Amino acid sequence: MSFTRKKGFYKQDVNKTAWELPKTYVSLTHIGSGAYGSVCSAIDKRSGEKVAIKKLSRPFQSEIFAKRAYRELLLLKHMQHENVIGLLDVFTPASSLRNFHDFYLVMPFMQTDLQKIMGMEFSEDKIQYLVYQMLKGLKYIHSAGVVHRDLKPGNLAVNEDCELKILDFGLARHTDVEMTGYVVTRWYRAPEVILSWMHYNQTVDIWSVGCIMAEMLTGKTLFKGKDYLDQLTQILKVTGVPGAEFVQKLNDKAAKSYIQSLPQSPKKDFSQLFPRASPQATDLLEKMLELDVDKRLTASQALAHPFFEPFRDPEEETEAQQPLEDSLEREKLIVDEWKQHIYKEIVNFSPIARKDSRRRSGMKLQ
């Protein structure tokens, strides 16, 4: 049998999966698995830094899997912002395209995510700092022409110094159900995405930030719908049933008829809904949890809100130097063609300097 693994690589079984990686990465520890792959922490011997390594699950099983793998690699390569996860390294044990079956993404290691710590009581200054970082990351992602579409607490990595990075952006497309057989949680999704009832824009992510911030204030999920219709019912209980001006904007006839059939109900008083929040916090929430996408705040507008005054540094609110160029986005390629494109990206990859915060908040999560 011919030897197909590159020199300098070693093999280790992790959680019943074979990992093959360069000898520069040691102390492999399994930290999680999902629909698209498994993640281990490791130490990079060159820097002594702890990193996260993701092995994609069967990236070339089908055209859909291969396209998603290509897009994930492209997105991670493009993102260079302290509040957005980026790529430190990418490698394959394959010595040529012919025996290329797997590849691994190396990213900064983060201790936990918001999902795991949602039960803790967040002080207002912690909420300010964490939400400010979410919005800085979104401003950058949006300026690259990317929309997250599936922002939720589990996609927000945090470390013990309250530093936050956005994960899994730009991947939540219609392929989710086809690939995994289940619908990703809808509790944080904007109504226009859940129901496809009107055009949507980058402010879909601002709605999600509103839901997450509300949960940090109360310790409870704001809109916990059992299904699509129940999700809408939960939302309208808070936002009120919209009037004729909003209904005119709906593209979907069924949604139009349904909304028109509902009895008018007023918007809830946010100061009563969030009694421990400051007036500035409730004002920001109202502007992020706005049903009408044309009236909802953008990331830039939200960053300028007085709620963030204690932490704001406009110089850190940077935009991408150029939009993400995904010339293959609309291409229908076969698996072998996707494989060629991915292999080329891996071979040509050169690491870039990390973008990390120049300042420290002095805050601790616990």
Swiss-Prot record:
The modification Phosphotyrosine is found at residue 182. The keyword Zinc does not apply. Dually phosphorylated on Thr-180 and Tyr-182 by MAP2K3/MKK3, MAP2K4/MKK4, MAP2K6/MKK6 and MAP2K7/MKK7, which activates the enzyme. Dephosphorylated by dual specificity phosphatase DUSP1. GO terms for biological process: intracellular signal transduction. Activated by phosphorylation on threonine and tyrosine by dual specificity kinases, MAP2K3/MKK3 MAP2K6/MKK6, MAP2K4/MKK4 and MAP2K7/MKK7. Activation by ultraviolet radiation, hyperosmotic shock, anisomycin or by TNF-alpha is mediated by MAP2K3/MKK3. Inhibited by dual specificity phosphatase DUSP1. The modification Phosphothreonine is found at residue 180. GO terms for cellular component: cytoplasm; nucleus. ATP binds at residues 31-39, 54. A motif (TXY) lies at residues 180-182. It comes from the Eukaryota. One of its GO terms (molecular function) is protein serine/threonine kinase activity. The modification Phosphoserine is found at residues 47, 350. Belongs to the protein kinase superfamily. CMGC Ser/Thr protein kinase family. MAP kinase subfamily. Serine/threonine kinase which acts as an essential component of the MAP kinase signal transduction pathway. MAPK13 is one of the four p38 MAPKs which play an important role in the cascades of cellular responses evoked by extracellular stimuli such as pro-inflammatory cytokines or physical stress leading to direct activation of transcription factors such as ELK1 and ATF2. Accordingly, p38 MAPKs phosphorylate a broad range of proteins and it has been estimated that they may have approximately 200 to 300 substrates each. MAPK13 is one of the less studied p38 MAPK isoforms. Interacts with MAPK8IP2. The TXY motif contains the threonine and tyrosine residues whose phosphorylation activates the MAP kinases. This is Mitogen-activated protein kinase 13. It comes from Bos taurus (Bovine). The gene is MAPK13.
